[in-house]
Amino acid sequence: MPEGPEIFLASRAVHAAVAQQPIELTLLHPALKPQARALRDVQVSRVVARSKAMLTEFSNGVVLYSHNQLYGEWVVHSKDEALLKRQVRLVINTAQHQVVLYSATDFAWLQTGAEHAHPYIAKLGPEVLDTAVSAAHIVNRLAQFPRRVIADALLDQHVLAGLGNYLRADVLLVARVNPLCKIGSLTAAQLLRVAKACKQLSQRSVQQAGVTRPWAQYMASKVTMAKADANLSYEAARFYAFDREGAPCWDCATPIVRVTQGGRGLFFCPTCQNAPA
């Protein structure tokens, strides 16, 4: 499932392609069609991300809530580009682009100003990517859930909004915190490291299109890996811990371990993440 940085990037791309200009809107999913008449001759005012959801606001006060879940995707195509062979939910045509929502099943029509009443949005915690949310805010928020396992809490959008499986694994490795510890057992220093890593890695993932490691380190790893196997993709070098079971930790060379926690794969370094506070 796309995480906060991916939805943030998608919302920015869609906004740049369609906002504040004439559009032709085609609604293809039955749940979307009731607004077809009301959305004639309108423009898109703005497109914003809310955790893993997107809000597309139209000039008549109607707002489209959409959540990609596992298979949905917003794609910006050029005007003459062939569409993907996937289920099309809606198309926003402009003079230069076709913006398509593919395969999503979770959407709703809302009104501007009432978005926070939507059940998903109403339960969101502080947005990690929000520039107004500081590391201190994150520390205070996490401290409200002392009995929660830190790895579980970071996936709970009610606790913090925008983190998913790859970010929680990498955040906890960078912070040198054992993912199975309860929040109440962590020191103030550990909580601050987690909070700072939440901000840093989320922002870096936006800036680097999903790469959580520093760019120079990532590129150096890619070059080294390519010498051993030319078929290795960027996936093998982009993360600190996520999806690297058995691969050496970038810092200490201990093999990364995978366990199942809450039905999800959880990756960590048993050496670095058992270090003292």
Regions found by a protein language model. Give the residues of each.
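Basic, nucleic-acid-binding surfaces and adjacent catalytic neighborhoods in DNA/RNA-processing proteins
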Residues: 22-36, 48, 144-277
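Gly/Gly-Pro- and Ser/Thr-rich, intrinsically disordered tail segments characteristic of DNA damage-repair
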Residues: 1-110
